[in-house]
Regions:
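Conserved acidic
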Residues: 1-220
């Protein structure tokens, strides 16, 4: 309240004003069920698994797709950055990502840079980290989860495939061998749409207790 002499006087209100923020942590158990497969969505990514044993047969195969460096590439492709660091963060992050490509997979150098790249996402939700920006965290994880859900839906509906497991940056499904090429085509179109790259692995069998306890047998 302003008085005639220009002095500001405080005034108490009968009904206190309350602001709500940070509500992204309210939903602790968000999930969807699609074709009898439950997908749990959360800050740590999407998760889901069908308990049991699944084996390759004469007519069906097990395909596993994994997003290459999902969290870093979502940030780089979509120009997502911690607000206080500015958009130049994306350029530096991309340079760091390209540096990793100079070293073969499995080498100490490659693994060290991979750890640094992925740590940015985790540290973006750490109050003691210079990367702290919860909005950045949510943009990355929601983008990744919805993008993967979109791809899983397309493969299940168009290929009549059955989801087996989904875990953070990838998923497995049981599919007729005659429809493998169709699935690969769907993935290729998805890659163009979202700007991410998928890595394919074929399994002979999967023995699943839950999303954190399973054994996969490679085809070769």
């Amino acid at each position: 309240e302003y008085l005639d002499n220009g002095v500001v006087k405080s005034r108490s209100k009968k009904v206190p004003k309350i602001s709500y923020y940070g509500c992204y942590n309210v939903a602790e158990t968000l999930n969807v069920v699609f074709k009898d497969f439950r997908i749990d969505l959360g800050l740590g990514g999407l998760h889901g698994a069908k308990k049991g044993t699944i084996k390759e047969s004469e007519t069906h195969s097990i395909m596993s797709y994994d997003v290459a460096s999902m969290y870093p590439n979502i940030a780089i492709t979509n120009r997502v950055y911690p607000e206080h660091l500015g958009e130049s963060f994306c350029d530096s992050y991309e340079d760091f990502y390209n540096e990793r490509k100079k070293f073969s997979k499995g080498t100490p150098e490659n693994l060290a840079i991979k750890l640094g790249l992925n740590s940015v996402y985790g540290k973006s939700n750490d109050k003691y980290s210079p990367f702290l920006d919860p909005m950045y965290t949510m943009k990355i994880t929601i983008n990744g989860q919805l993008s993967l859900c979109m791809l899983m839906e397309q493969i299940v509906l168009q290929c009549n495939a059955r989801l087996i497991m989904a875990n953070t940056d990838g998923f497995e499904f049981y599919i007729e061998k005659s429809k493998e090429d169709l699935a690969k085509s769907i993935v290729a179109d998805w890659e163009k749409t979202v700007g991410l790259q998928m890595e394919l692995v074929m399994y002979k069998a999967m023995y699943i207790k839950d999303v954190n306890n399973y054994v996969s047998v490679y085809e070769d």
